[in-house]
Regions:
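Bacterial N-terminal signal peptides
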Residues: 9-17
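Positively charged n-region of N-terminal signal peptides that target proteins for export
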Residues: 1-8
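Acidic, metal/ion-coordinating pockets
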Residues: 22-334
């Protein structure tokens, strides 16, 4: 009897192991624009991001929305600005320039954010010096980065997830950088490619034709999920050509200003599903957020939206989408 029981247990173990090898999930949390710093001309202002972080500590910013970032497999945000200890290379002719201390990578680490997109218009605020300092700070802090021809591949549970990104201005000049990013990630054997696009018109609640062109090109050349940033407000979600497009996630931790035009934003948790070693599709879990927990003041600490705020943000997403929007949405792989 004991031998028969042992054989049954062994059979169950083999069956369970085989099923586990055939199916799997990878959870990726996606957040929007993050300025971990402040404007250069505000450095001595007593209410800046720098002053608050010195007082509250690195864990302050994400403390109210930390759970999805800390319990997932990978997290991605758009890092708007430079991490550099001095102002060398400052492009004084730009209207807005953002700089934070290189030590602020600890904000990402404590929040559980492993990947950042740097393909945006503020990564260049302090010229070559700022770009080099930012990459060095991210590397020293253990954060992966992608964008501007840099690519990142993260392997989870045997599945390779690829990251890259492109600015709208770059794409309009030439498509080769995006094409080469996607070609590289496909050749590297990525099972899923998440591509960041810094695009669109600031504070527009609707995506435009240029965003559509970029998304279609990215998906046509291998992107599975396209993540939009730059408009600083939420936009819709669509399925195009077998890929998923998040037109704009809005701001998240935004140290660049005290006075926000809008506090509405979105965090999305993408649960990637695999079977027989192949990507099957993604479940998107929508988490509306407000970029400050002390409105109308910006205290650089987002919180999850509830009640009427939640409903309003979901409606804004619906208004810019061609499909029904809900808290959880399944998209089958192409």
């Amino acid at each position: 009897m004991q031998k028969k029981t042992a054989l049954v247990c062994l059979a169950c173990l083999i069956l369970c192991t085989s099923a586990s090898a055939l199916a799997g999930e990878v959870t990726v949390t996606l957040g929007g624009d993050c300025v971990l710093g402040t404007r250069e001309e505000w450095k001595k202002d007593p209410e800046t991001f720098d002053t608050l972080i010195a007082e509250k500590g690195y864990g302050w910013c994400f403390s109210k929305i930390a759970e999805p970032f800390q319990t997932d497999d990978i997290s991605l945000i758009n890092l708007e600005g430079v991490l550099q200890s001095g102002s060398q290379g400052h492009q004084r002719g730009k209207q807005f320039t953002f700089r934070g201390d290189p030590a602020y990578t600890a904000i990402l680490t404590e929040a559980g954010i492993e990947q950042v997109n740097i393909a945006n218009n503020h990564y260049i605020d302090f010229s070559r010096s700022g770009r080099e300092s930012t990459r060095a700070a991210l590397e020293a802090g253990g954060s992966g980065f992608s964008g501007y021809t840099y690519r990142s591949i993260v392997e989870v549970n045997g599945y390779k997830i690829g990251f890259a990104g492109c600015r709208e201005t770059t794409f309009l000049e030439r498509k080769a950088p995006m094409y080469n990013d996607l070609k590289y990630l496909k050749k590297a054997g990525c099972d899923v490619i998440i591509y960041s696009c810094h695009w669109g018109k600031e504070y527009s609640p609707t995506h435009n034709q240029t965003q559509i062109r970029m998304a279609d090109y990215a998906i046509k050349n291998g992107a599975d999920i396209v993540v939009g940033t730059h408009p600083h407000c939420v936009q819709g979600i669509d399925e195009r050509g077998g890929g998923v497009v998040l037109w704009s996630l809005g701001n998240l931790v935004f140290g660049g200003t005290h006075d926000m035009t809008t506090f509405d934003a979105l965090v999305v948790q993408a649960v990637l599903s695999f079977e027989n070693g192949k990507y099957q599709g993604v479940t998107l879990k929508l988490m509306p957020v407000l970029t400050s927990s002390d409105r109308p003041r910006n205290n650089f600490q987002p919180e999850f939206a509830t009640g009427g705020d939640y409903d309003r943000i979901m409606q804004l997403i619906q208004d810019d989408s061609t499909l029904p929007i809900g808290p959880e949405m399944w998209f089958e792989a192409k």
